[in-house]
Amino acid sequence: MSAKVVLDFEKPLFELEAKLHEMRECLRNTTRDQSPADADLLYGDIEALERKVELLRRSIYKNLTRWQKVQLARHPERPYSLDYIYMMTTGFVELAGDRHFSDDKAIIGGFARLEDEAAGFSQSVMMIGHQKGRDTKTNLYRNFGMAQPEGYRKALRLMKLAEKFRKPIITLIDTPGAFPGIEAEERGQAEAIARNLMEMAQLTVPVICVIIGEGASGGAIGLGVGNRILMAENSWYSVISPESCSSILWRSWNFKEQAAEALQPTAEDLLAQGIVDRIVPEPLGGAHTDPDAMGATLKAMLIEELQQLLPKEPQLLVRERIEKFSAMGVWNEV
């Protein structure tokens, strides 16, 4: 069994939880000849420590810095695209290949059914997302979630297929960036991403994009042009990672916390700036602490958005999408 991953700011909480676990084990192993008073005293200590743990947990996770949210977005136990697909949909059929070069395992996609009997909703959708690995072997297989040009071309092929059959598209974004290797550049990485932006803007079906973890630069925006942009509470979305920004501005990664503050990459920041439309709330401590609850929350929000988008005419969807992205950013005319 792999060891629990504890982030640096979580260590005080982890230490208290470990102490609480020890006390519970001590109570469980209490022998019959111990006095009731001793057991009552231990019960009282446990209850007091439980309250302290809960207060500390809320204090930590309700006051996260931007850099701490970046760390949570990268948590190795966090749900990935395939996890969400299997939690939210049924009948997922993965489709492979870009029909030009190869099948990029860093991007997955295929048709699935999104349904909620209580809401009276059932809809076939195209699910597309970045996919990371859980260990060294699967991370190498998935290229750490960094897509090659063929990955973006595969995604576009699936989007055009969904458009042909009039199915809405849902993209799940979670990448440290597009793969920066020489071979990716030789095969047209920039062109592949740019073409996705152009083509996604003109799709005549509803497109919903969800940042579920990391949303780094062109690697993220290559799947990020939609009618609705949703963002998980503890995810980040920016033109550059805090570490890379730090290395460029200060010639060192030691200023990543300051870079994160300057970049303002969190869901709250981007909602205020009008970049994203809704924040997907996470369980206290992050999506990985209760993946099922996180999946249910996201599923409900996706159904809400689709119920609003599906009745719209194709040309209205295109016009609203283009207007949405045209309004982003700040510039001066001279």
Swiss-Prot record:
The CoA carboxyltransferase C-terminal domain sits at: 48-308
Keywords attached to this entry: ATP-binding, Cytoplasm, Fatty acid biosynthesis, Fatty acid metabolism, Lipid biosynthesis, Lipid metabolism, Nucleotide-binding, Transferase
Look up the record and give one Gene Ontology term from the biological process aspect.
malonyl-CoA biosynthetic process
The protein's annotated catalytic reaction(s) are:
N(6)-carboxybiotinyl-L-lysyl-[protein] + acetyl-CoA = N(6)-biotinyl-L-lysyl-[protein] + malonyl-CoA
Q: Which one Pfam family would you cite for this protein?
A: ACCA
Q: Name one GO molecular function term.
A: acetyl-CoA carboxylase activity
Q: Identify the pathway.
A: Lipid metabolism; malonyl-CoA biosynthesis; malonyl-CoA from acetyl-CoA: step 1/1
Q: Name one GO cellular component term.
A: acetyl-CoA carboxylase complex
Q: Which InterPro entries match?
A: Acetyl_CoA_COase_a_su, ClpP/crotonase-like_dom_sf, COA_CT_C
Location comes to: Cytoplasm
List its EC numbers: 2.1.3.15
Q: Which domain of life is it from?
A: Bacteria
Q: What class of enzyme is it?
A: transferase
| Stated family | Belongs to the AccA family.
Q: Which HAMAP family match?
A: AcetylCoA_CT_alpha (MF_00823)
Quaternary structure and partners: Acetyl-CoA carboxylase is a heterohexamer composed of biotin carboxyl carrier protein (AccB), biotin carboxylase (AccC) and two subunits each of ACCase subunit alpha (AccA) and ACCase subunit beta (AccD).
Function, please?
Answer: Component of the acetyl coenzyme A carboxylase (ACC) complex. First, biotin carboxylase catalyzes the carboxylation of biotin on its carrier protein (BCCP) and then the CO(2) group is transferred by the carboxyltransferase to acetyl-CoA to form malonyl-CoA.
Instruction: Return the protein name.
Output: Acetyl-coenzyme A carboxylase carboxyl transferase subunit alpha
Q: Which gene encodes it?
A: accA
